[in-house]
């Protein structure tokens, strides 16, 4: 079912308000080193992660009680026809270390499809907003991916190589060998920069729904493509692997590289 523009406008305005609130909480706490807990999966969480998510969940429950919510730090996921997906601090390790690549990720899914996505980085005053069927905006202005003539000219971003399992490392190595430059550890900002035409490719693993859902409307609305490593469009059941490109032709080549590397 195609959503009315008025509904998309209302949800987008509401999501921007959520991002404003999360950003204010992050900015207020940025100067102090937070208390850190290591979760069972060895990732980090802080009291601020939980506080931000709880605040956003409360706002959603008040405004849209019939919507579902899935969050990284919250309780049991509630899935409805329309479901909000929250990552209160993407790049928690960077936040703990004071590196300004962390941010809040917000998405709205209609059934299995992300239709709204926000990457908000209060530390750099950057925000990317993607809405299905509309051009992506960075800082309020339309942004677009760039054409890339060949993989040997491409700039690749990737998460920490330590995140890749022994079985996945050949895919990363193949991408590293095929591209001109590599940038690691950019967290959510790396995907915003791809949407703005600053980088060309991104490869990741160990991702959950809240890590990737916002990227779909943001990258697609900027002219790019984002899938799993098999070339399938991302949905609620996807993960943990992601491959994104600003130029669809380079995405096809990268998929072939990854497939060959994993089959060797």
Regions flagged by a language model, labelled:
Residues 1-89, 264:
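N-terminal subdomain of lithium-sensitive/metallo-dependent phosphomonoesterases centered on the IMPase/IPPase/PAP
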Residues 22, 26, 49, 60, ...:
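Residue-level signal for inorganic ion chemistry
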Residues 35-36, 61, 75-77, 119, ...:
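Short secondary-structure boundary/capping segments
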Residues 49, 53, 72, 87-90, ...:
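Acidic active-site catalytic centers that drive phospho-/nucleotidyl reactions
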Residues 55, 103, 214-217:
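Short amphipathic alpha-helical face segments that pack within enzyme cores
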Residues 79-137:
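DPxDG-like acidic metal-binding loop motif
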Residues 138-142:
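A structural micro-motif at secondary-structure boundaries
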Residues 145-264:
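An extended, acidic
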């Amino acid at each position: 079912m195609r959503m009315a523009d008025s509904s998309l406008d209302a949800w987008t305005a509401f999501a921007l308000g959520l991002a404003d609130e999360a950003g204010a909480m992050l900015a207020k706490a940025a100067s102090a080193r937070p208390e850190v807990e290591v979760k069972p999966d060895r990732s980090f969480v802080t009291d601020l992660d939980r506080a931000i998510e709880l605040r956003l969940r409360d706002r959603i429950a008040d405004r849209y009680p019939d919507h579902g919510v899935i969050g990284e730090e919250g309780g049991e996921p509630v899935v409805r026809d329309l479901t909000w997906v929250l990552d209160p601090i993407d790049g928690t390790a960077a936040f703990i270390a004071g590196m300004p690549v962390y941010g809040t990720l917000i998405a709205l899914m209609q059934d299995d499809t992300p239709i709204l996505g926000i990457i908000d980085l209060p530390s750099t005053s950057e925000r990317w907003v993607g809405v299905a069927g509309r051009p992506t905006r960075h800082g309020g202005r339309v942004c677009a991916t760039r054409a890339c003539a060949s993989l040997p000219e491409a700039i690749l971003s990737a998460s920490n190589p330590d995140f890749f399992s022994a079985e996945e490392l050949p895919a990363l190595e193949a991408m590293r060998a095929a591209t001109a430059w590599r940038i690691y550890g950019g967290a959510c900002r790396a995907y915003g920069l791809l949407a703005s035409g600053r980088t060309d490719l991104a490869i990741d693993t160990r991702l959950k729904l809240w890590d990737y859902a916002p990227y779909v409307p943001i990258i697609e609305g900027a002219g790019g493509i984002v899938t799993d490593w098999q070339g399938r469009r991302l949905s609620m059941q996807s993960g943990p692997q992601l491959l994104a490109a600003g130029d669809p032709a380079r995405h096809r080549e990268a998929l072939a590289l990854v497939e060959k590397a994993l089959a060797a």
